[in-house]
């Protein structure tokens, strides 16, 4: 079974932990629990390859900016998440998360993930957002941001309804497998076996 280390990053309260819990347990947590660092494991088969997926959850709050990179060494793929109903979290992908990943883990594949699409599609929720002058992020904006940051793919999902949730993790594994297929056998990247190190 091939091990793959996936680290999920993004602003606080964008739904990172809910994604992981919903994916690994098929149950949506009913309350917000701020994360410091949590690890989960999942086994899956992607394109006939058996994968032991190590899922590393991180805290998005600024208080953890110095601790969070401790979970980065040996990362195979990042999920960079933003909430489609929180434009500031979308802007922070380019302003904060991409630079942080580039500093610690250049050349590690990124999947850009737009979360909470169930809320964007709910007329009542959209009305509430409009009252706060919030316009939800739409798919073309996610596609554009993915190109800007060099992400392998942009996927939208909902941890609540599980729409596209499995696809997020399958595509993350595919990004790792595709990168491995392109690398010369036995060649190590600068900074360690996977091109991600801590300085």
Curated annotation (Swiss-Prot):
What's a BP term from Gene Ontology annotated to this protein?
Answer: small GTPase-mediated signal transduction
Which residues are connected by disulfide bridges in this protein?
none
From what superkingdom does this record's organism come? Answer: Eukaryota
Q: Which residues carry this modification: Cysteine methyl ester?
A: 196
Q: Where in the cell is it found?
A: Cell membrane; Cytoplasm, Cytoskeleton; Cytoplasm
Membrane topology (UniProt)? Lipid-anchor
Q: Name one Pfam family in it.
A: Ras
**Where, by residue number, is the motif Switch 1?**
26-37
Instruction: Quote the SMART domains the UniProt record gives.
Output: RAB, RAN, RAS, RHO
Binding positions for GTP?
13, 15-18, 32, 35, 116, 118, 159
Main subcellular location = membrane
Q: Which UniProt keywords apply?
A: Cell membrane, Cytoplasm, Cytoskeleton, GTP-binding, Hydrolase, Lipoprotein, Magnesium, Membrane, Metal-binding, Methylation, Nucleotide-binding, Prenylation
GO MF annotations for this entry? GTP binding; GTPase activity; metal ion binding; protein kinase binding
Query: Which InterPro entries does the entry mention?
Result: P-loop_NTPase, Small_GTP-bd, Small_GTPase, Small_GTPase_Rho
Instruction: Give the lipid-moiety residues, type S-geranylgeranyl cysteine.
Output: 196
Query: What EC number(s) would the UniProt record show?
Result: 3.6.5.2
List of residues binding Mg(2+): 17, 35
Q: Which residues, in ranges, are excised as the propeptide?
A: 197-199
Q: Where is this motif: Switch 2?
A: 57-75
- UniProt xrefs under PROSITE patterns: RHO
- Cofactor requirements of the protein: Mg(2+)
Summarize the protein's role: Small GTPase which cycles between active GTP-bound and inactive GDP-bound states. Involved in actin cytoskeleton remodeling during capping of surface receptors and uroid formation.
In the record, the note on similarity to other proteins reads: Belongs to the small GTPase superfamily. Rho family.
Q: What is known of its domains?
A: The switch 1 and switch 2 motifs undergo large conformational changes during GTP/GDP cycle and play important roles in the interaction with downstream effectors.
- Entries under NCBIfam families matching the protein: small_GTP
Q: What is this protein called?
A: Rho-related protein racG
Per the UniProt entry, what species is this protein from, by scientific name? Answer: Entamoeba histolytica (strain ATCC 30459 / HM-1:IMSS / ABRM)
The upper taxonomy is: Eukaryota, Amoebozoa, Evosea, Archamoebae, Mastigamoebida
Instruction: Point out the gene that encodes the protein.
Output: RACG
């Amino acid at each position: 079974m091939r091990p793959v280390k996936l680290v999920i990053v993004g602003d606080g309260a964008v739904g990172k932990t809910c994604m992981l819990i919903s994916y690994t347990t098929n149950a949506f947590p009913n309350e917000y629990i701020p994360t410091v660092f949590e690890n989960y494991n999942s086994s899956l088969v992607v394109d006939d390859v058996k994968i032991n997926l190590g899922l590393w959850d991180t805290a998005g709050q600024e208080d953890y900016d110095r601790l969070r990179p401790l979970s980065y060494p040996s990362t195979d793929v990042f999920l960079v998440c933003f909430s489609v109903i929180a434009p500031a979290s979308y802007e922070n992908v380019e302003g904060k998360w991409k630079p942080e990943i580039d500093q610690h883990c250049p050349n590690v594949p990124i999947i850009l993930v737009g979360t909470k699409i169930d809320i964007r599609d709910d007329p009542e929720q959209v009305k509430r957002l409009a009252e706060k002058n919030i316009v939800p992020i739409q798919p073309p904006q996610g596609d554009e941001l993915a190109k800007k940051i060099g992400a392998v793919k942009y996927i939208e999902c909902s941890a609540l309804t599980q729409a596209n949730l499995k696809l997020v993790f399958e595509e993350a594994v595919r990004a790792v497998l595709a990168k491995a297929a392109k690398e010369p056998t036995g060649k190590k990247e600068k900074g360690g076996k996977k091109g991600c190190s801590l300085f």
